[in-house]
Amino acid sequence: MAADSDLRYYLGVKNAFLGHLNPQLNEASILYRNLGGAKFKDVSSEMNLVDLGWSGDATPIDGNNDGWPDLYVLSMQGHDEYYENVGGKRFEKKSRDVFPKTPWGAMGVKAFDFNNDLAVDLFLTDMHSDMSEDVGPEREKMKSRMQFGEEVLRSNGQSIFGNAFYQADGKGGFSEISDKIGAENYWPWGLSVADLNADGFQDAFLTSSMCFPYRYGVNSVLINEQGERFADAEFIVGIEPRANGQRIKPWFELDADELDVENRYCKDRTGKVVVWSALGSRSSAIFDLDDDGDLDIVTSEFNSEPMVLLSDLSDKKKINFLKIKLVGGESNRDALGARVVLKIGDRRLLQVYDGVSGYLSHSLHPLYFGLGESSQVDEIEIVWPSGKTETKIGPLDANQTLTIKENG
């Protein structure tokens, strides 16, 4: 009711879950240009970046290696979109040209170098494809046997019904290899990527599960086996099962005698009826919480308090690592967008500092490089967001935090 006592009505859409079928009703994603002084300008149309998909996330990635960040935009139902940055002047849609098939129900994304070839790969999680059927644990590592019809999917044969992993060829092309490397899991939200075992290859942590009325889904730890494939490790490293084996908790209460007597959960029951729901993680951050040299995980939870998962790796074995904190000068303060390469003998370790961590989340913390058996780094090369390249010559000792300032 408005202040003038005139009634206002809002009509909900019955098939809101199928909003992708009517993109003309959607709000467009917006690109804001930072003008400085806490002012921003909508430049979506000006930059040819008008996207009407049901998007919950996006990630920058320099897919064609021209030094300009391109943009991969997720769609929670339908086709993802990919826009190439044309010299910072505009974007060109290259979606199907570069990615012929994309996840139908994409929820999370992370760009990182999987196999240490200095090319940035792309890992996407797909949750909504898992909603089309109930499956048991035996199918959790398999693609969905999609049960929605084409009238809902609008796929035209261009969808992947599960997670996708696009391996970059370093020339602007990508190959989808999710099944080959074991990148599938069940009911994922977002993912965080970090070197959990400090061997020099980045691993992945995928938050999973859904609340009432769906069942519990385990959080996944995917250990990177030397850039060849992922190995499932959530039960080995102690992420699963949860503390005390807890997978559910009370969700809400019904009154089977009066208010909720017609509810299907109150049939043949009296008094108060407690409805239980599965626990589930939504997002995560990976960093060295207790400053002991290994990486810990903090999750955000639905209908529950956060989980703090402390690693004891450094208590069990000698590890080598290097943390790098970047401080922008000419670039943005946090140096978001910087590209860092460590040179260790014949090895090259690449990370792009984009802050992306978990579902709809960003985190600012030092870059963490696991060094394997190496106790020193020969050289660090940084390409700052400003375009400037700086090199820090070693040898640089492992097991420390370096603060590197642009033009410092």
Segments (PLM) and residue ranges:
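Surface-exposed loop and edge beta-strand positions of immunoglobulin-like domains
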Residues: 61, 74, 112, 125, ...
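Gly/Ser/Thr/Pro-enriched helix-cap/hinge segments flanking short amphipathic alpha-helices
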Residues: 173, 228-229, 233-238, 250, ...
